[in-house]
Amino acid sequence: MSEQTSAASTTDRGDRKTRRGYVVSDKMQKTVVVEVEDRVKHPLYAKVIRRTTKVKAHDEVETAGVGDLVLIAETRPLSATKRWRVVEVLERAK
């Protein structure tokens, strides 16, 4: 029985979601607002539609600026609205 509990504790916590998006605001301390684009097919007309969602992401070292393309990953709730963290800055704004 102890082998099962130790094996269960060392297993992965499941697949965490990762998203790419552009930073639209960096005015908060250690927080950036990232706009994530999702392409969905319309159920009736079958046209591909671009849907955007704004999420708040934790940026511990405050490296991301407005216009940067960033990779964000899902994490535990850090505040009332923050459930994502910045993994890396993929492309700097020009």
From Swiss-Prot:
One of its GO terms (cellular component) is cytosolic small ribosomal subunit. GO terms for biological process: translation. GO terms for molecular function: rRNA binding; structural constituent of ribosome. Residues 1-22 are annotated as: Disordered. Pfam families: Ribosomal_S17 (PF00366). It comes from the Bacteria. Keywords: Ribonucleoprotein, Ribosomal protein, RNA-binding, rRNA-binding. Part of the 30S ribosomal subunit. NCBIfam families: PRK05610.1 (NF004123), uS17_bact (TIGR03635). Belongs to the universal ribosomal protein uS17 family. One of the primary rRNA binding proteins, it binds specifically to the 5'-end of 16S ribosomal RNA. This is Small ribosomal subunit protein uS17.
